[in-house]
Structure formats: structure tokens, C-alpha cells
Curated annotation (Swiss-Prot):
Listed name of the protein: Protein transport protein SEC13
Location in the cell: Cytoplasmic vesicle, COPII-coated vesicle membrane; Endoplasmic reticulum membrane; Nucleus, Nuclear pore complex
Alphabetical UniProt keywords: Cytoplasmic vesicle, Endoplasmic reticulum, ER-Golgi transport, Membrane, mRNA transport, Nuclear pore complex, Nucleus, Protein transport, Repeat, Translocation, Transport, WD repeat
One example of a Gene Ontology biological process annotation: protein exit from endoplasmic reticulum
Family from the record: Belongs to the WD repeat SEC13 family.
Record GO cellular component, one term: nuclear pore outer ring
Subunit structure: The COPII coat is composed of at least 5 proteins: the SEC23/24 complex, the SEC13/31 complex, and the protein SAR1. Component of the nuclear pore complex (NPC). NPC constitutes the exclusive means of nucleocytoplasmic transport. NPCs allow the passive diffusion of ions and small molecules and the active, nuclear transport receptor-mediated bidirectional transport of macromolecules such as proteins, RNAs, ribonucleoparticles (RNPs), and ribosomal subunits across the nuclear envelope. Due to its 8-fold rotational symmetry, all subunits are present with 8 copies or multiples thereof.
WD repeat feature ranges: 7-46, 51-92, 97-140, 143-193, 200-242, 250-289
UniProt cross-references to Pfam families, sorted A to Z: WD40
Source superkingdom: Eukaryota
Protein's membrane topology: Peripheral membrane protein
InterPro entries the UniProt entry points to: Sec13/Seh1_fam, WD40/YVTN_repeat-like_dom_sf, WD40_repeat_dom_sf, WD40_rpt
Annotated function: Component of the coat protein complex II (COPII) which promotes the formation of transport vesicles from the endoplasmic reticulum (ER). The coat has two main functions, the physical deformation of the endoplasmic reticulum membrane into vesicles and the selection of cargo molecules. It also functions as a component of the nuclear pore complex (NPC). NPC components, collectively referred to as nucleoporins (NUPs), can play the role of both NPC structural components and of docking or interaction partners for transiently associated nuclear transport factors.
Organism per entry: Eremothecium gossypii (strain ATCC 10895 / CBS 109.51 / FGSC 9923 / NRRL Y-1056)
């Protein structure tokens, strides 16, 4: 385990390893992003990225097929795109379509191309396509009237309607209206249509995380200010969603983040109690605590 201290002067909001686990990006209320090289238990700060004018909430690495590229989002309403070439980092794009804090950024599964999903306190989420000629093509959707706190992609799957096969692009969003919503891309209209609304939380939904597993059953984890985590499941990408409380009693504090392992069978949760807990589904379909890490 790598422990990094004194990386930022204020609260750290996100820390993400790249595809190969060799680079770590962190972001903070100090308005900066730090890039580290990680090798085993050691790490080295290689660059500090400045460009945001407010706290930086989240960062996300693009798939390496697109190059060494990082997206960041901030309270300043901006999404910035950063690229490393020949050991030097530079800002290559600024994306400003939201009128309030941008709370999350997530690159799409690489099969869809360079698409970036952004959620904002202005009540909207957007999906922007970065074209080879340098232009962008955003789709902007009204999602949760009083703010979108988080959004994520479903893993890449193929939909076959009997005539042709095409990628089934789906998105989950979590809002300040306590709701989780599922959206599906409609290629004819070039927009995302509301497919399902999942109502079970009693306070703001803070994060949504779709399991990367490509099993016939979809798993979506949602965490909330109400101190609960819900696992939603759906069979074969259609039909009703089934709700399961991760544990019957509430967590000791608000839950901020949920993250699945690459294989999609272990769920990590972090919250206001400064602990990370790991959870795994047993053979009876019950969720069990697998480990607890004090931060």
C-alpha cells in the first residue's frame, strides 16, 4: 500500500490510478491536480497541474488507446483535459457548458470512442465527444432539478434487435432529489432517454457505481447522505431493477464514494468516518464485509 502525505495543502477529494497502475492523479480543494509515478511501495511527484479556479472534485484517466490523457472537474464549472507527451503535461482542452459546479467526470468504455460524461449542480449531465479535428459535440440532458451529484457508465455491451447489433450505451445518475436514474442512448435522436427511476434513498445520492462485470446480471451500487448503500440488480439489461440493502443497519457516517474492483465482484465504500470497507456477495446472495481499512 502506498501512503502519500503532503501532496496538497487542503482536502483531497479524489485519487485515481491509471490503466496500468503506474500513475496516480490526485485532486484537492487547493485547486490543483498532482501527478505521481508509482512503483511498488514508492512514489514520485512528477507534475502539478494548475488551471482550475475552485476546488477540484474528481479526475479520470482516459483509456491508453487515446494517449496519456486525464480529465478533471471543479466547482468553477469547468472540465479540463490534460495530456502528457514526452514527459511534459499540458492542458489541451477546456469544456464549459455547465452553469454550476461540475461534480463528476467519467470517460466512457473505450469501445464508444472518446466520450466524457459530466454531472453538474445545474441539474444536468452532459456527454461530450472529442473529435479528431479538435471540436467537441456535447449532448446535454436535464436530469435532476436540484443537482446531479454523480454519474457513471454501464460496461460496454452489445444489443441485438434482430436486424443489427449495436452498442447499448447506458448511464446512471444520482441526484440531490434522492433519486437514481437510468438513461439509454437513442442513436436516431442522438440523445439519452430516461429508462428507469430508482427511488429508495432518503437523502442526497452521493455516488453511483456500475459493476464492470459482463455477466447477464447488472449490478449498480448507490450510496447516500442517508448512510446507506443499495445494490440494484437487473437481469439481461431489461426488466425491473431489484433493490438490496448492503447491510440492514446504517453506516456510522455519510457515504461519499463507491468503487468496484476490475472483476466487478468486490465493492469498496468510503465515507465520513475515514474508513474504506470492502464487500463481497456470498453464494446465498448476501453481502458480507471482506475487509476494513482505516485511513
Amino acid at each position: 500500500m502506498v501512503t502519500i502525505t503532503n501532496a496538497h495543502t487542503e482536502l483531497i477529494h479524489d485519487a485515481v490510478l491509471d490503466y496500468y497502475g503506474k500513475r496516480l492523479a490526485t485532486c484537492s480543494s487547493d485547486k490543483t491536480i498532482q501527478i505521481f509515478e508509482v512503483d511498488g511501495d514508492s512514489h514520485k511527484l512528477v507534475d502539478s497541474l494548475h488551471g482550475h479556479e475552485g476546488p477540484v472534485w474528481q479526475v479520470d484517466w482516459a483509456h491508453p488507446k487515446f494517449g496519456v490523457i486525464l480529465a478533471s472537474c471543479s466547482y468553477d464549472g469547468k472540465v479540463l483535459i490534460w495530456k502528457e507527451e514526452n514527459g511534459r503535461w499540458s492542458q489541451i482542452a477546456a469544456y464549459e457548458v455547465h452553469s454550476a459546479s461540475v461534480n463528476s467526470v467519467k470517460w466512457a468504455p473505450h469501445e464508444y470512442g472518446p466520450l466524457l460524461l459530466c454531472s453538474s449542480s445545474d441539474g444536468k449531465f452532459s456527454v461530450v465527444e472529442f473529435k479528431e479535428n479538435g471540436t467537441t459535440s456535447p449532448i446535454i440532458i436535464d436530469a435532476h432539478a436540484i443537482g446531479v451529484n454523480a454519474a457513471c457508465w454501464a460496461p460496454a455491451t452489445i444489443e441485438d434487435d434482430g436486424q443489427q447489433s449495436q452498442h447499448l450505451r447506458r448511464i446512471a445518475t444520482g441526484g440531490a432529489d434522492n433519486l437514481v436514474k437510468i438513461w439509454k442512448y437513442n442513436p436516431e435522436a442522438n440523445t439519452y432517454l430516461l429508462e428507469d427511476t430508482l427511488a429508495a434513498h432518503a437523502d442526497w445520492v452521493r455516488d453511483v457505481a456500475w459493476s464492470p462485470s459482463v455477466l447477464p446480471r447488472a449490478y449498480l451500487a448507490t450510496v447516500s447522505q442517508d448512510r446507506t448503500c443499495i445494490i440494484w440488480t437487473q437481469e439481461n439489461n431489461q426488466g425491473p431493477w431489484t433493490k438490496t440493502l448492503l447491510k440492514e443497519d446504517k453506516f456510522p457516517d455519510v457515504l461519499w464514494r463507491a468503487s468496484w474492483s476490475l472483476s466487478g465482484n468486490i465493492l469498496a465504500l468510503s465515507g465520513g468516518d475515514n474508513k474504506v470497507t470492502l464487500w463481497k456477495e456470498n453464494l446465498e446472495g448476501k453481502w458480507e464485509s471482506a475487509a476494513e481499512i482505516e485511513q
